[in-house]
């Protein structure tokens, strides 16, 4: 027998009574975006659960994609069978004999939304249970926590049988908590921060600062690839490339070396905030981890934050580097992040950056520059690209193109 659909059980959105259908519709949209790499797959949702119709597509590939989508609590692959008792008996016997191992217990859980079906749920439980005993006489029934819970659902169009419950990613559907601007470098931390924001339903847009010729096309592609890895959790992400060369050259020419990093980060924050305002974002998200580098001391954060009143979310702020790496490996961004391309945060990094910069000093150095003009030109020069999910085979094609 071949799986015909995957039944989706919702996560935390089940508690959002007033906005329930908005959450469900957003989850449906996200599933359609992520599963768009499987052209024959279709998605339907209702108030209680979702249905992913495979239409001949390999179940295992689709299941791997579903495991990453936030808002899904669990899912079950299901067999579609003809809606009559004899067919159900044969299907249940075939499934049970294929999955049963010595000592396992079982339970039949039948329900029907089609109340015209010839047996009610209780009678169907008994009939199908007897059918299992007839082919597996040594099996034992267990009502609480059985090894195999065979679920049978009678719908208007057909009957569906499932026995597996596969854990989903949990969290909230991406886009149900508003929009945030993710400051995405090419490092390990910021993609993890983006992932954690996505998990809580934030629709992220990735803001990446590029400083050619100091940063290479390889660094830009790396940022694109990191963004694409994040699309598997909720669908398309807008990638915003910010031209940053002029600003970095100006800072280097007019400020003391010890303050280069602080001033650079203040400009980045101003620009990201301006983009956020233009694109109706609510927050800024970054990958700062307290004490990890000189620009991530509390004093540095205070000096950098001073340029905006917008909330700054730092999902990894209390994590050790190894904790962040563990998540990066889990979400498959780590190997990309360690590719040897310099980003604009490293190209002019001073040997001894100021770890406790003073706000009054940063403001004094910025008076030497046309801050507003620099910010306006950078924002005017942004390039926005839609990054979409892609199949693993596309990754191979991209690698071949890069080599050629």
UniProtKB/Swiss-Prot annotation:
<dbReference type="InterPro" id="IPR004114">
    <property type="entry name" value="THUMP_dom"/>
</dbReference>
<dbReference type="InterPro" id="IPR003720">
    <property type="entry name" value="tRNA_STrfase"/>
</dbReference>
<dbReference type="GO" id="GO:0002937">
    <property type="term" value="P:tRNA 4-thiouridine biosynthesis"/>
</dbReference>
<keyword id="KW-0784">Thiamine biosynthesis</keyword>
<dbReference type="GO" id="GO:0005524">
    <property type="term" value="F:ATP binding"/>
</dbReference>
<dbReference type="GO" id="GO:0009229">
    <property type="term" value="P:thiamine diphosphate biosynthetic process"/>
</dbReference>
<feature type="binding site">
    <location>
        <position position="296"/>
    </location>
    <ligand>
        <name>ATP</name>
    </ligand>
</feature>
<feature type="binding site">
    <location>
        <position position="265"/>
    </location>
    <ligand>
        <name>ATP</name>
    </ligand>
</feature>
<dbReference type="InterPro" id="IPR049961">
    <property type="entry name" value="ThiI_N"/>
</dbReference>
<dbReference type="InterPro" id="IPR050102">
    <property type="entry name" value="tRNA_sulfurtransferase_ThiI"/>
</dbReference>
<dbReference type="Pfam" id="PF22025">
    <property type="entry name" value="ThiI_fer"/>
</dbReference>
<dbReference type="GO" id="GO:0009228">
    <property type="term" value="P:thiamine biosynthetic process"/>
</dbReference>
<protein>
    <recommendedName>
        <fullName>Probable tRNA sulfurtransferase</fullName>
        <ecNumber>2.8.1.4</ecNumber>
    </recommendedName>
</protein>
<comment type="pathway">
    <text>Cofactor biosynthesis; thiamine diphosphate biosynthesis.</text>
</comment>
<keyword id="KW-0820">tRNA-binding</keyword>
<keyword id="KW-0963">Cytoplasm</keyword>
<feature type="binding site">
    <location>
        <position position="287"/>
    </location>
    <ligand>
        <name>ATP</name>
    </ligand>
</feature>
<comment type="similarity">
    <text>Belongs to the ThiI family.</text>
</comment>
<feature type="domain" description="THUMP">
    <location>
        <begin position="60"/>
        <end position="165"/>
    </location>
</feature>
<keyword id="KW-0547">Nucleotide-binding</keyword>
<dbReference type="Pfam" id="PF02568">
    <property type="entry name" value="ThiI"/>
</dbReference>
<dbReference type="GO" id="GO:0004810">
    <property type="term" value="F:CCA tRNA nucleotidyltransferase activity"/>
</dbReference>
<dbReference type="Pfam" id="PF02926">
    <property type="entry name" value="THUMP"/>
</dbReference>
<dbReference type="GO" id="GO:0000049">
    <property type="term" value="F:tRNA binding"/>
</dbReference>
<dbReference type="InterPro" id="IPR054173">
    <property type="entry name" value="ThiI_fer"/>
</dbReference>
<feature type="binding site">
    <location>
        <begin position="208"/>
        <end position="209"/>
    </location>
    <ligand>
        <name>ATP</name>
    </ligand>
</feature>
<feature type="binding site">
    <location>
        <begin position="183"/>
        <end position="184"/>
    </location>
    <ligand>
        <name>ATP</name>
    </ligand>
</feature>
<keyword id="KW-0694">RNA-binding</keyword>
<dbReference type="GO" id="GO:0005829">
    <property type="term" value="C:cytosol"/>
</dbReference>
<dbReference type="InterPro" id="IPR049962">
    <property type="entry name" value="THUMP_ThiI"/>
</dbReference>
<dbReference type="InterPro" id="IPR014729">
    <property type="entry name" value="Rossmann-like_a/b/a_fold"/>
</dbReference>
<keyword id="KW-0067">ATP-binding</keyword>
<dbReference type="GO" id="GO:0140741">
    <property type="term" value="F:tRNA-uracil-4 sulfurtransferase activity"/>
</dbReference>
<dbReference type="GO" id="GO:0052837">
    <property type="term" value="P:thiazole biosynthetic process"/>
</dbReference>
<comment type="function">
    <text>Catalyzes the ATP-dependent transfer of a sulfur to tRNA to produce 4-thiouridine in position 8 of tRNAs, which functions as a near-UV photosensor. Also catalyzes the transfer of sulfur to the sulfur carrier protein ThiS, forming ThiS-thiocarboxylate. This is a step in the synthesis of thiazole, in the thiamine biosynthesis pathway. The sulfur is donated as persulfide by IscS.</text>
</comment>
<dbReference type="InterPro" id="IPR020536">
    <property type="entry name" value="ThiI_AANH"/>
</dbReference>
<keyword id="KW-0808">Transferase</keyword>
């Amino acid at each position: 027998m071949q799986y015909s659909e995957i039944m989706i059980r919702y996560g935390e959105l089940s508690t959002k009574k007033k906005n329930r259908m908005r959450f469900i519709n957003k989850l449906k949209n996200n599933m359609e975006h992520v599963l768009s790499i499987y052209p024959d797959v279709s998605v339907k949702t209702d108030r209680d659960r979702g249905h992913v119709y495979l239409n001949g597509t390999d179940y295992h590939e689709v299941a791997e994609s579903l495991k990453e989508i936030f808002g899904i609590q669990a899912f079950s692959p299901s067999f579609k069978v003809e809606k009559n008792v004899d067919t159900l008996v044969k299907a249940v016997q075939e499934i049970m004999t294929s999955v049963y191992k010595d000592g396992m217990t079982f339970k039949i859980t039948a329900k029907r939304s089609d109340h015209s079906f010839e047996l009610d749920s209780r009678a169907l439980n008994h009939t199908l249970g007897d059918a299992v005993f007839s082919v597996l006489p040594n099996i034992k029934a267990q009502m609480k926590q059985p090894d195999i819970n065979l679920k049978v659902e009678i719908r208007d169009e057909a009957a569906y049988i499932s026995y597996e419950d596969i854990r989903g990613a949990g969290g909230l559907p991406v886009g149900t908590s508003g929009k945030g601007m993710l400051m995405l470098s090419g490092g390990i931390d910021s993609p993890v921060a983006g992932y954690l924001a996505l998990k809580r339903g934030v629709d992220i847009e990735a803001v990446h600062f590029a400083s050619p010729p100091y940063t290479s096309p390889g660094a830009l592609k790396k940022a694109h690839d990191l963004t694409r890895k994040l699309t598997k959790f909720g669908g398309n992400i807008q990638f915003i490339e910010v031209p940053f060369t002029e600003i970095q050259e100006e800072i280097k020419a007019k400020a003391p070396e010890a303050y280069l990093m602080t001033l650079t980060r203040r400009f980045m924050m101003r620009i990201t905030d301006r983009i956020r305002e233009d694109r109706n974002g609510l927050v800024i998200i970054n990958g700062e981890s307290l004490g990890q580098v000189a620009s991530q001391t509390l004093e540095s954060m205070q000096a950098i934050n001073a340029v905006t009143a917008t909330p700054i979310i730092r999902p990894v702020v209390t994590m050790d580097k190894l904790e962040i790496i563990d998540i990066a490996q889990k979400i498959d961004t780590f190997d990309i992040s360690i590719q040897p391309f310099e980003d604009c945060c490293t190209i002019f990094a001073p040997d001894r950056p100021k770890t406790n910069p003073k706000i009054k000093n940063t403001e004094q150095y910025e008076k030497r520059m046309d801050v507003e003009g620099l910010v306006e030109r950078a924002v005017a020069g942004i390039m926005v690209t839609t990054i979409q999910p892609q199949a693993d085979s596309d990754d191979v094609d991209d690698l071949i193109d890069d080599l050629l």
